UniProtKB/Swiss-Prot annotation:
Basic residues bias locations: 64-77
GO CC, any one term: ribosome
Quaternary structure annotation from Swiss-Prot or TrEMBL: Part of the 50S ribosomal subunit.
Entry superkingdom: Bacteria
Region (Disordered): 63-93
GO MF, one example: structural constituent of ribosome
Chain's gene name: rplD
Keyword Glycoprotein assigned: no
Protein name as annotated: Large ribosomal subunit protein uL4
Role this protein plays: One of the primary rRNA binding proteins, this protein initially binds near the 5'-end of the 23S rRNA. It is important during the early stages of 50S assembly. It makes multiple contacts with different domains of the 23S rRNA in the assembled 50S subunit and ribosome.
Length: 206
């Protein structure tokens, strides 16, 4: 499929052909959802922790004698049923990450790109270069292109002035092409690709 290439000033700068093997798939929500769950599980901190009965600071002595009181049998006050006792089966520090095959991860990215193209939410920009590191000027250019909520993917490296100017614009994320991922594609309204990013993606998936 051919898309018109734009400049940051909003002018046409030719056309680019997008590979159907990357951008032309019928999006599968189940695969995209699997990749998003994998990403979010991997970034989850897992620092949750509660103290069990072996860790709470209370006496370990038997509360009262076993027989003759008419009351229920108990050992120490650390037991979970008592106020101040340890938590039974409480959270522990752990990693929430789980495995996902590389083929599924790659397929999920292609389906996310295809979903964006199907929704007509992909814009290809000729070159992501700013003459000066001025947020106001770049924000105006983005507004004229309708980029109020966007993920911008550049080449292997983001040009310095562009990176500095863009980093303070709300709801706009800028990543090099090696940082492209399913979750960030979906959480932003528009996906902006530089020509270098398109070439890198086609090289990656060929």
């Amino acid at each position: 499929m051919d898309l018109t290439v734009k400049t940051l000033e909003g002018k046409d700068a030719g056309k680019v052909s997008l590979s159907d093997a990357i951008f032309g798939l019928e999006p599968r929500e189940d695969i995209i959802a699997r990749v998003v769950r994998w990403q979010l599980a991997k970034r989850q901190q897992g620092t949750h922790k509660s103290k069990g009965r072996a860790e709470v600071s209370r006496t370990g002595a038997k509360m009262y004698k076993q027989k003759g009181t008419g009351r229920a049998r108990h050992h120490s006050a650390r037991a979970p049923q008592f106020r101040g006792g340890g938590k039974a089966h409480g959270p522990v520090v752990r990693s929430h990450a789980h495995d996902l095959p590389k083929k599924i991860r790659a397929l999920g990215l292609r389906h996310a790109l295809s979903a964006k193209l199907k929704a007509e939410d992909i814009i290809v920009i000729d070159d992501l270069v700013a003459n000066e590191a001025k947020t106001k000027a770049l924000a105006g250019a983005f507004a004229s292109l309708g980029l109020t909520n966007a993920l911008i993917i550049g080449g292997a490296e983001i040009e310095g002035n562009f990176k500095l100017a863009a980093q303070n614009i709300p709801n706009v994320d800028v990543l090099p092409v090696q940082g492209i991922n399913v979750y960030d594609i979906l959480r932003r309204g528009k996906l902006v690709l530089s020509k270098a990013a398109v070439e890198a993606l086609e090289e990656r998936f060929k």
